[in-house]
Amino acid sequence: MRTQSLKPYHANYHSLTTNDSPARVDAPTDSGLISEFVYSENQPVVTQLLLPLLQQLSKQSRWLLWLTPQQKLSRSWLKQSGLPINKVVQLRQINPLSTVEAMEKALLTGNYSVVLGWLPELTEDDRIRLRLAAKLGNAYGFVMRPLNDTKVGSGQCATLKIHSYLYH
């Protein structure tokens, strides 16, 4: 996988649209990215796909942010994966519905090369807001959503799960 460095870009979020003109973004088209990953927890292919990109992005001077509402990242997994512990920030125990807003704000700051968020299903408005924030912050945003692999009728609730080996 080849990764291209992102050009720095700074703009005032509120100056991008006006009431008398159509919405527009002055950011270059390659200055940010939002991707949604819907994955099966039984097949950790997402880890295999994302890890090289995360390792590359960790070489930037900016942070890597993990928005994980319920779980705690495993320091041993970070070390084993080659991700710098001193550049990883994690916010957890936040309301999953507030995670979209938290992700948008984090992307806008420009302090993070990548923001990973475990989010509920996004609305089109959420997608637009996150894309704009990623462009303005010159960052990657990865929306992570595991498929509901829990069998109906097995007595288990449908909950958000993250691979346990990633967390304590």
Swiss-Prot record:
Matches recorded under InterPro entries: Cell_div_suppressor_SulA (IPR004596), P-loop_NTPase (IPR027417), SulA_CellDiv_inhibitor (IPR050356), SulA_enterobact (IPR047696)
Alphabetic keyword roster: Cell cycle, Cell division, DNA damage, Septation, SOS response
SUPFAM superfamilies, per the entry: P-loop containing nucleoside triphosphate hydrolases (SSF52540)
Induction: By DNA damage, as part of the SOS response.
Region (FtsZ binding): 106-112
One Pfam family this sequence matches: SulA
Record PTM: Is rapidly cleaved and degraded by the Lon protease once DNA damage is repaired.
Region (Lon protease binding): 161-168
Function: Component of the SOS system and an inhibitor of cell division. Accumulation of SulA causes rapid cessation of cell division and the appearance of long, non-septate filaments. In the presence of GTP, binds a polymerization-competent form of FtsZ in a 1:1 ratio, thus inhibiting FtsZ polymerization and therefore preventing it from participating in the assembly of the Z ring. This mechanism prevents the premature segregation of damaged DNA to daughter cells during cell division.
SUBUNIT field: Interacts with FtsZ.
Family that this chain belongs to: Belongs to the SulA family.
Name of the protein: Cell division inhibitor SulA
Gene source species: Yersinia pseudotuberculosis serotype O:1b (strain IP 31758)
